[in-house]
């Protein structure tokens, strides 16, 4: 079980065509934060590779007083941006609150093509509502990706992040 403000995974092996990161029971120390990720190309630092993304969400309040979605989150997508990519936003930090989801990253070892990804996360959001967030895009780089960082926009988190290689 990981506890901290960020988790970095380094892999210099090109064994797999796809990597799947399974994030389970991610719990935030502070409410209202975003769970995010970014990558580094081999030999680079800063976790600020150029990325183009799209993101949408759905949610439903516990007391059935409101639903929303699917809603496109224009303020959270990027067009050749370098910021961290939002996986889940406005998290709750109640004792029973957490988020879980999966990140799929394709062809990270390629030195010819851009690197596509898609994600799906679900969990408890602020104001007692459940949410589901979908993000997709590509890293506009042709160098091999060898590092990925998961982090919270502010504060710490704990949870389990597992990496699987898919041939």
Where are these regions (language model features)?
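Surface-exposed molecular-recognition determinants
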Residues: 5-6, 10-167
């Amino acid at each position: 079980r990981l506890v901290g403000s960020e988790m970095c995974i380094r892999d210099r092996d090109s064994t797999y065509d796809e990597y799947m990161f399974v994030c389970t029971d991610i719990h935030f120390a502070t409410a209202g934060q975003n769970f995010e990720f970014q990558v580094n190309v081999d030999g680079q630092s800063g976790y600020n590779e150029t990325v183009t993304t799209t993101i949408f969400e759905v949610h439903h309040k516990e007391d059935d007083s409101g639903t929303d979605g699917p809603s496109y989150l224009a303020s959270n997508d990027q067009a050749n941006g370098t910021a961290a990519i939002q996986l889940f936003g406005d998290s709750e930090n109640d004792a029973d609150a957490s988020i879980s989801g999966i990140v799929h990253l394709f062809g990270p070892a390629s030195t010819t093509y851009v690197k596509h990804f898609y994600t799906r996360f679900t969990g408890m959001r602020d104001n007692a509502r459940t949410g589901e967030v979908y993000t997709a895009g590509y890293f506009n780089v042709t160098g091999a990706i060898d590092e990925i960082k998961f982090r919270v926009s502010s504060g710490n988190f704990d949870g389990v992040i597992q990496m699987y290689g898919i041939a």
